[in-house]
Amino acid sequence: MSSNNLIKQLQERGLIAQVTDENALAERLAQGPVSLYCGFDPTADSLHLGHLVPLLCLKRFQLAGHKPVALVGGATGLIGDPSFKATERKLNTEATVKEWVEKIRRQVSPFLDFDCGENSAKTANNYDWFGNMDVLAFLRDIGKHFSVNQMINKEAVKQRLNRDDVGISFTEFSYNLLQSYDFARLNEVHGVELQIGGSDQWGNITSGIDLTRRITQKQVFGMTVPLITKSDGTKFGKTEGGAVWLDPKKTSPYKFYQFWINTADADVYRFLKFFTFMNLEDIDALEEEDKNSGKAPRAQYVLAEQVTGMVHGEEGLAAAKRITESLFSGAAADLTEADFAQLAQDGMPVIELEKGADLQQALVNAGLVPSRGQARTMISSNAVAINGEKQSEPEYLFTDSNRLFDRYTLLRRGKKHDCLICWK
């Protein structure tokens, strides 16, 4: 992605929701490298898929020769952003937020290049400037630039202000001032001229632009990426189990890979534009190929490979593909102990059994059949497999050879109903 016509290229990918003074920004980008930032608040111990588009947008700017700053909100994370939130956020302890700041800083780092000369990336933490700021300095130096009349008219907080049952605390109401000052501070220290963020951050970004201009008398810009929606109207980045996290301990690489494999045909080519660095011509060619192949589309596998490899590395991608192929065939021989640990984490239903259990009881406990009688019928009709091997003996007792790594057994009824036994 070149710096020339960068705005146009981002628009062609559908990556711009709003931008301030588009022509002036395009002109500034054409003049030479720009420092830009995106903020990530530590509201949990991991980023999730909702953070990925703005994070990748930082990378797109860096690849075009610009200088990204990833700001982790050690201070703003203690307050909580009320933007479009129906209720007050729970306040986390300083120790918790500090721990999450470090985790998120480590999570962001692999996406950016911190050693590439003039446009090397930087990280920052807004606790560094808010941590020792006293309340009088905050009110005099920052608060005086804000009109409450304008603040209460921002769409991001209107819904809370209009609800008598919830309302908004002064703590959350003041969040807008903190994020605004981040922009002014980063402009002074790092020469940051552009802030990017999700479309829910538009109000905070424009406030930051106003404050920066008042304090520094410099022109700065803001840009938001769209809120990603699915064609069926359901929320993107969620599964039945909740959010899809970037931390492999919270969402395994296998589960992450499967999330992308299950992308609807109506969404997949759009998501390739949002979440990968494939050329638009290649995405269009893939769409045309899928349309004319008469087979299942290949796009979901391309998307899953590209994003899983980017987030979890080649090793994580290889494990995800290995698990997927093994489960498709029903065989467990190629799975490593770490692969089984991924399945136990979030890959399929799991039960624990004492050694000496029989196959009928395992099927009932796993919810694969309603009764021992039904289990006997299923086993006799050759519809049950242990680690990919059919088992037709109704009174079968598990043996040590069934326990892979002395811990795991893969149980299958029919072609699609799986359960992982973890032996006590």
From Swiss-Prot:
So where does ATP get bound?
K238
Q: Where does L-tyrosine bind?
A: Y37, Y175, Q179
The listed locations are: Cytoplasm
Provide the S4 RNA-binding domain boundaries: 357-414
| InterPro entries named among the record's database cross-references | aa-tRNA-synth_I_CS, aa-tRNA-synth_Ic, Rossmann-like_a/b/a_fold, S4_RNA-bd, S4_RNA-bd_sf, SYY-like_C, Tyr-tRNA-ligase, Tyr-tRNA-ligase_bac-type
GO biological process terms, alphabetically, are: tyrosyl-tRNA aminoacylation
Motif 'KMSKS' region extends across: 235-239
Q: Which domain of life is it from?
A: Bacteria
Reactions performed catalytically: tRNA(Tyr) + L-tyrosine + ATP = L-tyrosyl-tRNA(Tyr) + AMP + diphosphate + H(+)
The main enzyme category here is: ligase
UniProt KW keywords: Aminoacyl-tRNA synthetase, ATP-binding, Cytoplasm, Ligase, Nucleotide-binding, Protein biosynthesis, RNA-binding
Q: Which GO terms describe its molecular function?
A: ATP binding; RNA binding; tyrosine-tRNA ligase activity
Q: Give the enzyme's EC designation.
A: 6.1.1.1
Q: Where is this motif: 'HIGH' region?
A: 42-51
Query: Predominant location of this chain?
Result: cytoplasm
GO cellular-component term (any): cytosol
Protein task: Catalyzes the attachment of tyrosine to tRNA(Tyr) in a two-step reaction: tyrosine is first activated by ATP to form Tyr-AMP and then transferred to the acceptor end of tRNA(Tyr).
* Record note on quaternary structure: Homodimer.
The family database entries (NCBIfam families) matched by this protein are listed as:
tyrS (TIGR00234)
Q: Which family does it belong to?
A: Belongs to the class-I aminoacyl-tRNA synthetase family. TyrS type 1 subfamily.
Q: What is this protein called?
A: Tyrosine--tRNA ligase 1
Which species is the source of this protein? Photorhabdus laumondii subsp. laumondii (strain DSM 15139 / CIP 105565 / TT01) (Photorhabdus luminescens subsp. laumondii)
